[in-house]
Amino acid sequence: MDTLNSYNKKDLRAYYKKLRCSLTDEQARKMDQEIMIQFRKIPIQGKGLKAALIYIPISHTREVDTKQCIQYLQEEIKPGLQVAFPKTNFTTLDMDAILPEAATTFTETKHRLTEPDGGQKIAPGAIDVVLLPLLVFDQKGNRVGYGKGFYDRLLAKCRPDVLRIGLSYLPPITQIEDVTEFDIPLDYCATPDRLYDFTNQ
């Protein structure tokens, strides 16, 4: 494994992509279960959630699976919770939250993202909670994604009280060097070992 010499986003992105892809299927499945234990500790009971935006994991980059999170939210936290999924536009670098309908199918794009074909677009202001993909996060709740800024742009349009949750197989680093004013931090991040709470920072 290469040595990490700096903590800027570009180097972190390259390093943690390789590190995460080195995980075996068995390791990932085990950690998915452990992350779910921590996810359940997030104080979202009684919040009156109506709509969530949840990413569909990219298998070849070893993103944390979200199926159990969806099941937990819809069955134990808020029966009938609307779960929307991202649909990206690589020309405008914008992203919409799409609520699938009965006839909605999901296809893999040329960027290897699984996205809904059709469905109902949900206004950013109607979203109560967002599960964000990430490669690495730091002890202040900042995250490094894939570099296009899709989620930060969407979050900027959401209500200030939207709940921002990350899922990570790996623990945080001390600090991401090149955080900007456009980077929107997490409220919580669930890892296999613990739940990180950034709401009081």
What annotation goes with each model-predicted range?
Residues M1-K9, K18-D25, G80, Q120, ...:
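Surface-exposed, charge/polar-rich loops and edge strands
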Residues D2-K110, T114-I122:
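N-terminal active-site beta-alpha-beta segment that forms phosphate/nucleotide-binding
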Residues I37-R40, K148, C189:
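Structured catalytic/translocation cores of nucleotide/phosphate-coupled proteins
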Residues I56, K87, L99, E115, ...:
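Short, structured patches in soluble enzyme cores that scaffold and shape functional sites
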Residues P57-H60, L135-Q139:
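Short glycine-rich anion-binding loops that position phosphate/pyrophosphate groups of nucleotides
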Residues K67-Q71, Y146-Y151:
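Charged helix-capping and loop-helix junction motifs
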Residues T92, V130-L134:
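A short beta-strand-loop-alpha-helix capping motif that often carries His-Thr
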Residues T107, G125, V144-K148:
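Short, amphipathic alpha-helical segments
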